[in-house]
């Protein structure tokens, strides 16, 4: 969900050719599967694209300028896989209100559409901070955003 939201927002800003956004799971059990039906529903309701095929984290993902984890367990696994600490952040750490909430973005997989809407809201609150981070990185490289 976060990948589709952020990539779409970057595209609307004209940055799709400058910033690459990918998504991958730390487990391989859903590799190749489409987005969960509730994820697709929520994304569609909010005007985002829904096409997705799940992938497993690989060297390409781990070499990104920033790897964003949704939960502490993902963070631990990504550290064990070798993602440098300076390149690893929790999604909610980009939300200015995150100090008032747990940093985990709850996985709604076994939940209702309402649970997916709640996850959407949590991600949506974090994305402005992630945009700010991208803008800072681009500015440091002399690229206008």
Name each model-derived stretch.
Residues 1-145:
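Short polar/charged helix/loop
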């Amino acid at each position: 969900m976060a990948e589709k939201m952020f990539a779409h927002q970057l595209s609307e800003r004209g940055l799709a050719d400058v910033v690459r956004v990918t998504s991958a799971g730390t487990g391989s059990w859903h590799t190749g599967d489409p987005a969960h039906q509730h994820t697709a529903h929520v994304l569609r309701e909010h005007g985002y694209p829904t096409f997705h095929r799940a992938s497993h984290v690989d060297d390409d993902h781990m070499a990104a300028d920033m790897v964003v984890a949704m939960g502490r367990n993902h963070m631990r696994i990504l550290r064990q896989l070798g993602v440098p600490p300076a390149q690893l952040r929790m999604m909610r750490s980009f939300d200015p209100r995150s100090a008032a909430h747990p940093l985990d973005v709850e996985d709604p997989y076994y939940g209702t559409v309402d649970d997916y809407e709640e996850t959407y809201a949590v991600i949506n609150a974090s994305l402005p901070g992630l945009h700010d981070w991208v803008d800072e990185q681009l500015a440091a490289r002399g690229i206008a955003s």
